[in-house]
Amino acid sequence: MKRLTILGSTGSVGKSTLTVVRNNPDKFKVTALAAGKNIQVMAEQCLEFRPQYAAMADEVSAKELRQLLIEQGCKTEVFFGEQAACDLAALNDVDQVMSGIVGVAGLLPTLAAIRAGKQILLANKESLITSGRFFMDAVAKHNAQLLPIDSEHNAIFQSLPEVIQRNLGRGDLKQYGIANIILTGSGGPFRHTPLEQLAFVTPDQACAHPNWSMGRKISVDSATMMNKGLEYIEACCLFNASAAEMEVVVHPQSVIHSMVRYQDGSVIAQLGTPDMCTPIAYAMAYPNRIASGVEPLDFYSLGTLTFSKPDYERYPCLKLAIEACHAGQAATTVLNAANEEIVKIFLQNGISFTDIAIINRQVVEKLNLSEPQSIEEVLQIDNLARDLAIKTIRSFIR
């Protein structure tokens, strides 16, 4: 039985992870849960799965959770703060760590799991976007194992030879006959919206993804295709891919989750119903297979699968992310931090949908920084980018 810490248990990925545990109670034991401030959901999870430990982001939330659990006779020990999340990620009696905290807040707990030599189920793409080189070096140094959870990277992982699966970030794609990696994306809910109407898109409209059930921040990133741009950066890092070895394809049906094209002309793809429980179950059981609880793909009802090139006029955030990827780690860190702050204000109705790309580009172009030489420098760049993004946003506030 594998013992599990879930970082970000009350979020979308965390809930899906617990669904897989629920469907496979003989294979997994939840040892620890960590979350932000969603006390009610965390309490429900603790009462159902009875973890030994739980952590909340702040002392007030932890105190309320502790009281709720005591009243229900639950003996879960409750802690708070970033260090608590790091400690739970590195527990001696844990085998797997689900890294599901959204944003750069997930970086240090994920690194703690790596330094403890854990098997890391990586849903926190920001860890690679901001700290890719240091992150992958730490994985190798501490003999940790990385398994990607994003549906696209999980699909690519499944389509690669085992020798690359077990040597992420270091394998030579060409040596193993791989021509390029094909990253698919739905294009979000505004593929056909007239460009002049995009400025009037509301947060609720941007969060209504046609295929996937996700959190609000990642739903907005999907609508701008920033999410695909961040996944492009992550894929280059995970699979040691150059610009010439990467391709982005818009695939509205979200049935093919990504592909690998080989030098002999073969293309290997991973298909499935759009549900995060599938890649999560794959990673949790790797190299075996278990029930995910997801409805099997019905080929008779699929209809037509379509593909097109991304329109950079419609998706300027995708173009910016690809440019940042090949500019270096400082640029990707700036972009990620700025985008988090910008999307936060958009979700509060503070700026327009089209302002997201404009402000992101302004921040990236203004902050032309040298490459970071440590995690500490990455976090400094992150803070600088957030400060500049917040200042820049002020002139756009409606």
From Swiss-Prot:
Residues given in the record as 1-deoxy-D-xylulose 5-phosphate binding sites: K125, S151, E152, S186, H209, S222, N227, K228, E231
InterPro entries in the record: DXP_reductoisomerase, DXP_reductoisomerase_C, DXP_reductoisomerase_N, DXPR_C, DXPR_C_sf, NAD(P)-bd_dom_sf
Positions bound to Mn(2+): D150, E152, E231
MF (Gene Ontology): 1-deoxy-D-xylulose-5-phosphate reductoisomerase activity; manganese ion binding; NADPH binding
UniProt cofactor(s): Mg(2+); Mn(2+)
Binding site for NADPH: T10, G11, S12, V13, G36, K37, N38, N124, E126, G215
Function summary: Catalyzes the NADPH-dependent rearrangement and reduction of 1-deoxy-D-xylulose-5-phosphate (DXP) to 2-C-methyl-D-erythritol 4-phosphate (MEP).
The protein, known as: 1-deoxy-D-xylulose 5-phosphate reductoisomerase
The species this protein was found in: Photorhabdus laumondii subsp. laumondii (strain DSM 15139 / CIP 105565 / TT01) (Photorhabdus luminescens subsp. laumondii)
